[in-house]
Amino acid sequence: MRTTITLSFLCIFSFSLMAQDMSAPLHERLSENYEQFKESSIRHRRFKHQDLQPLIEQVKGEEGFRVKKLGESIEGRSISMVSIGSGETSVLLWSQMHGNEPTASMAIMDIFNFFRQENDFEEVKARIKQELTLHFIPMLNPDGAERFQRRNANGVDLNRDALRLQNPEAQILKDVRDSLDADWGFNLHDQGKYYAAGPSPYTASISVLAPAFNYNKDINGNRANAMQLIGIMHEVLQAHIPNRIGRYNDDFEPRAFGDNIQKWGTRTILIESGGYPNDPEKQVLRKMNFLILLESFSSISEGSYRDMPLRVYESIPFNSYNHLHDLILRKVAVPKDGKTYTLDLGIRRFEVDYDRNSKYFLRSSIQDIGDLSTSHAYEEFNAEGYEVEMGKSYPKLIKKQKKLSKLDPIELLKEGYTSIKLKESLDPWITAALPLHISGPFSQRAPIALGYEPSLLFKKGGKITYVLVNGFLWNLEKEEQIIRDMLQERLGM
């Protein structure tokens, strides 16, 4: 009897947990199950048309998917549209209009997997497919993606070609929009990582906009609907990346596709993926795109967005441009000409492409000096109380890379040597961002000045505890093993 009661209790408890899980908001359930939908063949931002095309070909034979070749880019790369569903409401999404803005393209591949697989979301999928017809144009600018650049092969910003339509990629988008007379449009982009969400220390990791359709920035019914749906997105994002949502300036741009598609009668939403801490390949933001797009499809299919007050959209802070740095060193005692100046140093890191734009390494430089109390950074260091000196160059010229193995990098750094002159020439991506600066025989020490990448020593009680090398700050006590491993892997030290 006791066994029967126990089993009955377990069944009821399990059913209760299942019901509780199914009653959780859609975005929470999607987040918990995201890894099963994430397309494993794409893990970094610099994928090409040749990487994406097999995934589009793969869904051609899948039930419920329709694939149509829309045309070709200037250099002859195919541009396709993938359609899902048969509902009366048409939704058009286009990504990578700018070739170096790939985050949403990754998310679209994940969305394809969501609809392809049998999973716990069959009811949601069925409703979306019954009420909506989704049309995806992934990688509208494949020639730009090949070079990992914003513009197309003609050097044109496609988002300024909505009126003249001089480029085939722009013509394709306009023709599709007109032929569908789409009810909704999602304009999917990336933005720079130095935007903040308002005057705050938080990155604008996702920025949104219901673009204006005229210079007066009037709000008609369609634009209001777009604002309401953005309110739904905002609530989802606040649950996952709180305070990291920004709003784009809504000044009317007469040449832009988003503004014009809004004007042509499609409820248009701009989504921009910015920066997020410790997410250089934007995999967190890829997931956020996945969540807010599927939540949007669900909301449109139910009509629930109509209950969202406009004040939610209006409460989203505007982007603060140029507000962030990668690293800010605060209250640095900068020595110069026998005097000491207390200054903040704002350092940014820039990607330098190589291997046909499929890889990159980082170069850093000081981008601002002075009182940076109104700026913020992904990483900050309070240098107050530290004595600051310029890093020294190791006095001996090393002829061959293999000779570096005889040097102890930690001992060098503790003695103030941040640079080694090497006669043998190494590829720049090998030496970039290392805890030691590897330079040529005749290189000069970089000063603390705008546009330069100085090496600095931070001392307390005569002991060097931190070093700044190649734009990165290193703690010699806590990160000794990381430093050793990095130099061993790259240089054999």
Regions found by a protein language model. Name each.
Residues 19-46, 180, 209-219, 223-493:
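C-terminal accessory segments enriched in acidic
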Residues 74-97:
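Acidic/His- and Gly-rich active-site-bordering loop/insert found
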Residues 1-23:
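Bacterial Sec-dependent N-terminal signal peptides
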Residues 76, 145, 257-260:
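Short beta-strand/turn micro-motifs at beta-sheet edges
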Residues 88-90, 97, 102-243, 262:
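Active-site/substrate-binding loop(s) of hydrolase catalytic cores
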Residues 51, 55, 169-172, 229, ...:
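Well-ordered alpha-helical segments embedded in enzymatic catalytic cores
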Residues 67-71, 120-125, 244-250:
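Surface-exposed patches in mature extracellular/periplasmic domains of secreted proteins
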Residues 21-78:
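Short glycine- and acidic-rich boundary segments immediately preceding or forming the N-terminal edge
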